Each structure stands twice: as C-alpha cells, then as structure tokens.
C-alpha cells in the first residue's frame, strides 16, 4: 500500500493543477482531468522520469447517461485510459470527461501512444466520441453505412436495420428490423429431479 501512496503523491506533484482530481481508492489511482488538460496530462504521465507510463493497455468510451440504475447528473461521456509503467511496475487510470453530450469530442493521444489508434477508432464507432487529430478515424467494427453507435445506452437493443441476402437482387440489402416479440417461458428444473435421480 505504501507504493500506491508514493505513486499518488508523485502524480499529484507532477500534474499539479492539470489533474482536476486524483483519486486513490481500492488500491488504484485514478486521474480525472478536463479535456483541455488531457494531452498535457497524458504526455506528463508518459514522459516524466518519475512516472514513465510508457504503455497504454486500454482506452474505451463510457456512457454514464444511466449509472447505478438512476439518471446521471454529470457529463454523459468519458474516455477512460489504462496505463502501465513496466519500469516501475505500476498502473494508473485516466478519465477525461467529454464536454459536449450531443457531439462528444476529445483530443487524440495516438501521437503519444501508438496503441491508442485502434482503441480510439473503437470508441468512435461504438460510442460516437470524436477524436481530434486522429490519423484515421473511421469505423472499425460496424459497417460503413451503419446508423448510430451501438454501445450508447439510448441505442435500441434490436438496432434500426437488419441485413440479409436477397436472392432476386443477388446482393445484400438492408431493411427495417422485423423482430416479432414472443413470450418465453423458462424451463424450471426441480432439485429432486435434477440429474435424473
């Protein structure tokens, strides 16, 4: 636990006011910063000799519109990065809140961490978060003609359109979703008959 406290103090000392909030909880350090400080925070964490978080392990978008089964009062979208210092054997999380809920935009960290390239494309594709100065921001998991962003909490579970092969046209076509609701009755297995006994 002493190393977590040392890391906490080092991060607070290095980042200063750029880190909006530094949280130490459950044996982990989380840095929450504003979008205008995001690049400088990530650069400091990467380059500073006392920190040296040279590896971006993960970057993802988060939609907080409903959080813990209730309406969320803060910003809707955040980008969360998990960083690793191989040299110091330490991990840190960075959360940046995106300013605009209607058109979420944050700066790209692909110039600092090469691995951010595809992670940012995934966050763009699934959450609609735009990354300024990204070298190749385009969809990575859904079709190019896909409408919407499927990991947003307001996206319908069934989607908007479905794709199928049309024998007459000899090509793949899109059509509105045609899912018929049905009642599903669960099969109940009684303990006394379980396993054929």
Curated annotation (Swiss-Prot):
Protein's UniProt keywords contain Translocase: yes
Extent of the signal sequence: none
Cellular location(s): Cell inner membrane
Membrane topology term: Peripheral membrane protein
InterPro entries, per the entry: NADH_DH_suC, NADH_quin_OxRdtase_su_C/D-like, NADH_UbQ_OxRdtase_30kDa_su, NADH_UbQ_OxRdtase_CS
Keywords: Cell inner membrane, Cell membrane, Membrane, NAD, Quinone, Translocase, Transport, Ubiquinone
One Pfam family recorded for the sequence: Complex1_30kDa
Recorded GO MF terms: NADH dehydrogenase (ubiquinone) activity; NADH:ubiquinone reductase (non-electrogenic) activity; quinone binding
One Gene Ontology cellular component annotation held by this UniProt entry: plasma membrane
Catalytic activity: a quinone + NADH + 5 H(+)(in) = a quinol + NAD(+) + 4 H(+)(out)
EC number in record: 7.1.1.-
Principal subcellular localization: membrane
Source domain of life: Bacteria
HAMAP family for the chain: NDH1_NuoC
Function, as annotated: NDH-1 shuttles electrons from NADH, via FMN and iron-sulfur (Fe-S) centers, to quinones in the respiratory chain. The immediate electron acceptor for the enzyme in this species is believed to be ubiquinone. Couples the redox reaction to proton translocation (for every two electrons transferred, four hydrogen ions are translocated across the cytoplasmic membrane), and thus conserves the redox energy in a proton gradient.
PANTHER family documented for this protein: NADH DEHYDROGENASE [UBIQUINONE] IRON-SULFUR PROTEIN 3, MITOCHONDRIAL, NADH DEHYDROGENASE UBIQUINONE IRON-SULFUR PROTEIN 3
Family: Belongs to the complex I 30 kDa subunit family.
Quaternary state and interactors: NDH-1 is composed of 14 different subunits. Subunits NuoB, C, D, E, F, and G constitute the peripheral sector of the complex.
Entry protein name: NADH-quinone oxidoreductase subunit C
Species: Neisseria gonorrhoeae (strain ATCC 700825 / FA 1090)
Gene assigned in the entry: nuoC
């Amino acid at each position: 636990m002493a190393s977590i406290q040392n890391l906490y103090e080092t991060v607070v000392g290095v980042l200063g006011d750029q880190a909006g909030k530094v949280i130490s909880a459950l044996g982990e350090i989380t840095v929450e910063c504003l979008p205008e400080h995001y690049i400088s925070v990530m650069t400091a964490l990467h380059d500073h000799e006392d920190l040296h978080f040279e590896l971006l392990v993960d970057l993802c978008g988060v939609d907080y519109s409903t959080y813990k089964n209730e309406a969320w009062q803060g910003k809707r979208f955040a980008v969360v990065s998990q960083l690793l210092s191989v040299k110091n054997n330490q991990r840190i999380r960075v959360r940046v809140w995106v300013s605009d809920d209607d058109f979420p935009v944050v700066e790209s960290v692909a110039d600092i961490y090469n691995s951010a390239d595809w992670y940012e494309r995934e966050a763009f594709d699934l959450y609609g978060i735009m990354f300024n100065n990204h070298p190749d921001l385009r969809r990575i998991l859904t079709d190019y003609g896909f409408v919407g962003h499927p990991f947003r909490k307001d996206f319908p579970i069934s989607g908007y359109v479905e794709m199928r092969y049309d024998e007459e046209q000899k090509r793949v076509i899109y059509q509105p979703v045609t899912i018929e609701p049905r009642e599903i009755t669960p099969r109940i297995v009684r303990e006394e008959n379980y396993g054929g006994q």
